[in-house]
């Protein structure tokens, strides 16, 4: 009987990009800017960095070590990994929470993925000529125009089915030919497109309202300069540092953005070799995520939103929402 050859990561670069891709997402580009605005602007970075150093990085290394250890016994999910470490029956039942966490994340991330695909397609055909068009398109996409509580959009379901099928196909390709291959392409493209969007957003010139500029470069839908958004986001309010809720929010953001306690890091790390360096590789993946969050995420959503909605329209919206609705 021939033994099945165990899959491994083909390269360290692929592993880092896959781990970063596991972490980079809504938390970076939508949740982080909203949390920063709500919790002191630029001053939010102080508890944020403290939480990253004291909680984020150590816990990432713990999860990497746990995953690698469990992988030596052939376990690639949290129940098996916990069972190999604890040696008591109840440990594997605690690991079930890791499975449920990933199931819940996948259930709503597929919807977000399908919405993003639909928005990209509509953007290519020039469907967002006005800010109001974006809201109407979202209502059409989720079926809320019907006026029913349990509205269903056929097009929304079609995009969802396509994204679900695409994800299943990638996973069926395995570790190196599926996840790692896509990560090597997708992560560089994500960073490139995010950088382009950030630069393009900062170049918006208002063509309407009291700040309108008479220029061919002016955007007739923009009413403010995007740099006002940067100032709004990063002007520090140090008084907020005395509020315990700000520190809790910073820790929560670190847990959310690094995917700590969700079981996915355990799974990825279980395919490491026994002598692989988890300290350097884990830190590299974490800092890649932080670059996407603080540098890129902090330069996209708020400046662009301020350019089209103004500070007065943004302030109330961002303080009453997490940033998801504003993003779409």
Give the label of every model feature segment.
Residues 48-57, 98-124, 159-172, 188-202, ...:
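Hydrophobic core segments of alpha-helical transmembrane domains in multi-pass membrane transport
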Residues 15-22, 48-53, 65, 95-106, ...:
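Hydrophobic alpha-helical transmembrane segments of multi-pass small-molecule transporters/permeases
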Residues 3-7, 35-39, 69, 74-97, ...:
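Inter-helical loop and helix-membrane interface segments of multi-pass membrane transporters/permeases
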